Regions:
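Macrodomain-like recognition of ADP-ribose-binding/processing modules
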Residues: 1-155
Length: 155
C-alpha cells in the first residue's frame, strides 16, 4: 500500500501534487508554497489542475472588523459545503485522468485548521456520492486512508 509522504519533494512523471489552497489562490505557505515552488502551481488560481499539481480550496480570507474605516482580514476555513464541492470536482477529475496518479497531501490540516477527521470524512462523503467506479489513481495520506478504509470506501 502506498501513502503520500508528509514531505513529498519529488513526483514521478505521471504524479500530481494535491494541496490545499485559499480562495484567492495565493500559494504563500504550507503545501501550497511547495506546489508553487516545485510543482507548477499558479498564483491566482485557487482550484484545479496547474502544472504538476491540483489545488483544493480549504481556507479563505474574511473581514474581521468590517465596520472600521480600515478593516482587517483574517483567515478562516471555507464552509464544509465549499470543501465538499471541491472534493467532488477533484474526484471527478481523477476519474477522467486515469493516466495520472494523484498524491493527496493532508489538505486543510495545517494553516487552514481542519482536523484530519473532518477532511477525510468530507472526502468520504464525496466518494460515497459517486455513481461511477471510484478511481484507483489517488494516493492518500495514511491518516486519510485509515478513515476511508474504515468507512469501506477504499481497499
Amino acid at each position: 500500500m502506498e501513502f503520500t509522504p508528509d514531505n513529498l519533494a519529488k513526483l514521478p512523471d505521471d504524479g500530481v501534487f494535491v494541496f490545499g489552497s485559499n480562495t484567492d489562490g495565493e500559494h504563500c505557505g504550507g503545501a501550497a508554497l511547495v506546489a508553487l515552488k516545485r510543482f507548477g502551481a499558479v498564483n491566482g488560481q485557487a482550484e484545479g489542475p496547474q502544472g504538476q499539481s491540483y489545488a483544493i480550496p480549504t481556507m479563505e480570507y474574511v473581514e474581521i472588523n468590517a465596520e472600521d474605516e480600515f478593516p482587517e482580514y483574517g483567515k478562516a476555513r471555507v464552509p464544509r459545503e465549499v470543501l465538499l464541492e471541491a472534493c467532488d470536482r477533484f474526484i471527478l477529475y481523477t476519474s477522467q485522468h486515469p493516466e495520472l496518479r494523484f498524491y493527496v497531501t493532508k489538505i486543510g490540516c495545517g494553516i487552514a485548521g481542519w482536523s484530519v477527521e473532518e477532511v477525510a470524512e468530507t472526502f468520504a462523503t464525496a466518494l460515497a456520492s459517486f455513481l461511477i467506479p471510484l478511481p484507483d489513481n489517488i494516493v492518500w495520506p495514511r491518516e486519510f486512508y485509515e478513515i476511508l478504509h474504515r468507512d469501506g470506501l477504499v481497499d
